[in-house]
Amino acid sequence: MSAANPETPNSTISREASTQSSSAAASQGWVLPEGKIVPNTVFVGGIDARMDETEIGSCFGRYGSVKEVKIITNRTGVSKGYGFVSFVNDVDVQKIVGSQIHFHGKKLKLGPAIRKQKLCARHVQPRPLVVNPPPPPQFQNVWRNPNTETYLQPQITPNPVTQHVQAYSAYPHSPGQVITGCQLLVYNYQEYPTYPDSAFQVTTGYQLPVYNYQPFPAYPRSPFQVTAGYQLPVYNYQAFPAYPNSPFQVATGYQFPVYNYQPFPAYPSSPFQVTAGYQLPVYNYQAFPAYPNSPFQVATGYQFPVYNYQAFPAYPNSPVQVTTGYQLPVYNYQAFPAYPNSPFQVATGYQFPVYNYQAFPAYPNSPVQVTTGYQLPVYNYQAFPAYPNSPFQVATGYQFPVYNYQAFPAYPNSPVQVTTGYQLPVYNYQAFPAYPNSAVQVTTGYQFHVYNYQMPPQCPVGEQRRNLWTEAYKWWYLVCLIQRRD
């Protein structure tokens, strides 16, 4: 029997390496599959989407010269969460497997690389029945190297802490699409629409973990669309409009749990629309305009409980409109312009109590307008344009102290415009086109206290002042000479 099966040194080394790696793997809770241990190669599990092959190779460079790093992906190119690291020289695989390696704040699962053995049927021993069946014939968990050698990953015992990032598409023919920008860690952001014929689309930006943001519209023919931005966990933000024929649309941004944000307009014929952004629980934000013929609309952003945000203008013919964003209780936000013919409008965003936000332009014929965003007390934000015929407008958003943002165009026909976003102190961002009839506009972002942002006329200083005194003296001297001759 000994002559039939001689034991070579290589087989002894292979058996010892297998025994050592098996003990190291057992210490980490693995059940190694049948096969031959590949020397100088380590299995690496727990790889997430943030890790690439270059970084992993640099991490394992402390143990020896890395020959190749291979991250296993599926047919769509998405990482399966594991891979293999092979070394050029002989390394102590048992030492590497027994070490604790943390990468990007996450502990990696290490083990020996196992090469699948091609066994004949007569040499296969009967094995006990396993609960989990082996992978299908397409070998989703197998890595093939250029030498046509096949490696199996060690079977890791279930761990409730372990997170899996595999993607499972419920409907292969689903029209859902995900367009991503800068990618952060994303888990299970595939969509599982209830109706495969739904025209649901999701456009994502910076991705944070997103769970179950699929829509389940009450009516499959509803033109419901959701445009998502920075995604936080979103639950049940489907729309169930009271009237299936309503043109209701919701565009969501940062998503928080949203409940009952469907609109129930008092008049089904009202052109009421709601555009939602950062969604918090929203209750009763339907519009009940005092006048059914009023063109009142409400566009909501960060939603807090909203009460009584209908507009009751002092003059029914006034073209006043109110656009609300982050909603807190709003009182007295109707506009009472000093001049009933003034085309004054106010569009509010984050709503806090607002006082005295009417515009009192220096020239009653000025078409000045003010649009406010995050509302805190605002004082003296009237515009005093240098030219009374200038169609100057100011639309403010996130406001920090703003100085000198009036426009003094040089060319009246210039279509120059200035659009600002998050406002920090802004100086001299006026446009100086050549014509004073310019349709210049300034749009700013969130509103904080704004003081004295009118542009006062500049007084002469320094050399300019001395030159003015010299000119004045010359004129005065001439006047005196003329009077003396008379």
UniProtKB/Swiss-Prot annotation:
Sample GO molecular function, one term: translation activator activity
Low complexity composition-biased segments: 11-27
A Gene Ontology cellular-component term: cytoplasm
Cell compartment(s), UniProt: Cytoplasm; Nucleus
Region Disordered, residue ranges: 1-27
Biased composition (Polar residues): 1-10
InterPro entries xrefs: DAZ_dom, DAZ_RRM_vert, Nucleotide-bd_a/b_plait_sf, RBD_domain_sf, RRM_dom
Annotated DAZ domain residues: 167-190, 191-214, 215-238, 239-262, 263-286, 287-310, 311-334, 335-358, 359-382, 383-406, 407-430, 431-454
Pfam families in the cross-refs: Daz, RRM_1
UniProt keyword Cytoplasm, yes or no: yes
One annotated GO biological process: 3'-UTR-mediated mRNA stabilization
Expression sites (tissue/organ): Testis specific.
Stored Gene3D superfamilies: 3.30.70.330
Keywords associated with the record: Cytoplasm, Developmental protein, Differentiation, Nucleus, Repeat, RNA-binding, Spermatogenesis
Every RRM domain range: 40-115
Oligomeric and partner information: Forms a heterodimer with BOLL and DAZL. Interacts with PUM2, DAZAP1, DAZAP2, DZIP1 and DZIP3.
Disease tied to this entry: Spermatogenic failure Y-linked 2: A disorder resulting in the absence (azoospermia) or reduction (oligozoospermia) of sperm in the semen, leading to male infertility.
Other information: The DAZ proteins (DAZ, DAZ2, DAZ4 and DAZ4) are all encoded by a strongly repeated region of the Y chromosome, in two clusters each comprising an inverted pair of DAZ genes. They are very similar, which gives their indidual characterization difficult. Thus, most experiments do not discriminate between the different members. One can therefore suppose that reported interactions with a DAZ protein involve all the 4 proteins.
Similarity annotation: Belongs to the RRM DAZ family.
Written domain comment of the UniProt record: The DAZ domains are essential and mediate the interaction with DAZAP1 and DAZAP2.
Protein's job: RNA-binding protein that plays an essential role in spermatogenesis. May act by binding to the 3'-UTR of mRNAs and regulating their translation.
Name this protein carries in UniProt: Deleted in azoospermia protein 3
